[in-house]
Amino acid sequence: MHLRHLFSLRLRGSLLLGSLLVASSFSTQAAEEMLRKAVGKGAYEMAYSQQENALWLATSQSRKLDKGGVVYRLDPVTLEVTQAIHNDLKPFGATINNTTQTLWFGNTVNSAVTAIDAKTGEVKGRLVLDDRKRTEEVRPLQPRELVADDATNTVYISGIGKDSVIWVVDGENIKLKTAIQNTGKMSTGLALDSKGKRLYTTNADGELITIDTADNKILSRKKLLDDGKEHFFINISLDTARQRAFITDSKAAEVLVVDTRNGNILAKVAAPESLAVLFNPARNEAYVTHRQAGKVSVIDAKSYKVVKTFDTPTHPNSLALSADGKTLYVSVKQKSTKQQEATQPDDVIRIAL
């Protein structure tokens, strides 16, 4: 065999081996970056506990076959189910008080909230927030978002309807302290600045409402955009250090960044219509789910640009972060309609940031 031919064969072999190693490296990196596991039907919000080293997922299960729902406790690394907490009421919204290690779940269709001991999985109590019977004329308000103030052991819950409220619940006794009235049409978004004693809510009227948690009074309300277009500011997440709010809009292809001191818009980030949003102070980033687009965006909170996009089909829903800000969790729903439920369970995705 000629020396030149032998060299050519060796070169081609080296190039092929190199390309295989590179492809394998990229494949391994992608696998390490994102882990996806099927968990259960009707997946909604999540809560993370560093103390318990666990992630909880609220699932409503089948609309037709299951009367209640299940809260799954997951290993935050492998996403394997380590406990299934069955409930007679369906859980949707979720939060945790990290001081008392109490999980709170909103039972939307029953206008109630359930408290669960994070360590044992035992139900600590339940509170019906709107006991009116549903009729053609009466629509009881429904719990949507929940936030817990660890410092005061208070839970704030947005009760949505044509004219929404925010319920203020005593976490120790699981009793209603008061209801903050007149928070607008479908005031779904809810975020708390515990140190600043401020609670923020957003609604389908296009408003940002600021509440003083010292007396539970509305301090201000501002229509964020006056452009003649329809807006539904569905969720909000805070950067309390820089007094900014990241606000998603399910009706417009942009995420707003707002100065919480005055309601002025700092930036409009181009992105598909959005659902959940979560700010990560450890990385100065915000994460956003785009339900219809089937994607999750990473927004650089310095440049206000989308710097990365994860494909998360079919419908990415809610977000949670590990305590160190190095891991993002996404609940992902399968395609489903009122006529045809999803046949497969919904998923949770773990993303290494």
From Swiss-Prot:
Origin: domain of life: Bacteria
Keywords assigned by UniProt, alphabetized: Signal
Paired cysteines (S-S): none
Presence of the UniProt keyword Phosphoprotein in the record: no
SUPFAM superfamilies, alphabetized: C-terminal (heme d1) domain of cytochrome cd1-nitrite reductase
PANTHER family: DIHYDRO-HEME D1 DEHYDROGENASE, PROTEIN NIRF
Annotated protein name in UniProt: Uncharacterized protein YncE
Native organism: Escherichia coli O157:H7
Annotated gene: yncE
